[in-house]
């Protein structure tokens, strides 16, 4: 049988009885009642119409240099100072000539890239054209060989047979003999 809670050593039961005799909850209640708390203080709120609350104090505005913040996402050419208050990315260079030279350099690079693309396209087109011509030449050679073979077969027939009438009669005889021939049949066991 399974052991029950009641059965066990005598010492364990004595310890359990000793714990039951001491009420812990009652002791903690006594401590809470005896502890004195200071009386709650009343917090007086100031009137909202008081002049000190109505005044707007000016807060100091710090510049970027004073704060020492790093400049992010700011790519400016060397020697160019952006005037404050202007929108980003609109005008970097006050000198129009410098701007035009930079623009001309960028355009020249782009045109070079476009020209190289055009050259590649032309080369690819030439290669395609050459391949197409080769394929046409091969087809022409095949056709010429086929025509030569046909001509040689025709000439051999002409040399063997006497006239064209006998050639016309021969196929009719062959077709009639084929139809009169025995039909093949398959039987399954």
Curated annotation (Swiss-Prot):
GO terms for cellular component: nucleolus; preribosome, large subunit precursor. It comes from the Eukaryota. Keywords: Coiled coil, mRNA transport, Nucleus, Ribosome biogenesis, Transport. Residues 106-160 form a coiled coil. GO terms for molecular function: mRNA binding. InterPro entries: Loc1. One of its GO terms (biological process) is intracellular mRNA localization. Residues 39-49, 130-151, 166-177 have a biased composition (Basic and acidic residues). It is found in: Nucleus, Nucleolus. Residues 1-69, 130-189 are annotated as: Disordered. Residues 179-189 have a biased composition (Basic residues). Component of the 66S pre-ribosomal particle. Belongs to the LOC1 family. Required for efficient assembly and nuclear export of the 60S ribosomal subunit. This is 60S ribosomal subunit assembly/export protein loc1. The gene is loc1.
């Amino acid at each position: 049988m399974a052991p029950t809670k009641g059965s066990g050593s005598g010492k364990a039961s004595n310890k359990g009885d000793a714990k039951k005799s001491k009420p812990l909850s009652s002791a903690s209640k006594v401590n809470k009642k005896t502890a004195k708390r200071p009386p709650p203080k009343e917090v007086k709120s100031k009137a909202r119409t008081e002049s000190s609350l109505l005044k707007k104090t000016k807060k100091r505005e710090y510049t970027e240099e004073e704060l020492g913040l790093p400049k992010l996402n700011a790519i400016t050419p060397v020697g160019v100072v952006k005037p404050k208050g202007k929108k980003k990315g609109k005008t970097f260079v006050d000198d129009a000539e410098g701007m035009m030279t930079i623009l001309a350099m960028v355009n020249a690079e782009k045109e070079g890239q476009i020209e190289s693309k055009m050259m590649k396209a032309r080369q690819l087109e030439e290669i395609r054209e050459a391949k197409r011509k080769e394929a046409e030449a091969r087809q022409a050679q095949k056709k010429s060989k086929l025509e030569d073979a046909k001509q040689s077969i025709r000439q051999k027939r002409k040399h063997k047979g006497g006239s064209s009438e006998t050639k016309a009669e021969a196929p009719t005889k062959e077709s009639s003999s084929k139809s009169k021939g025995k039909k093949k049949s398959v039987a399954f066991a």
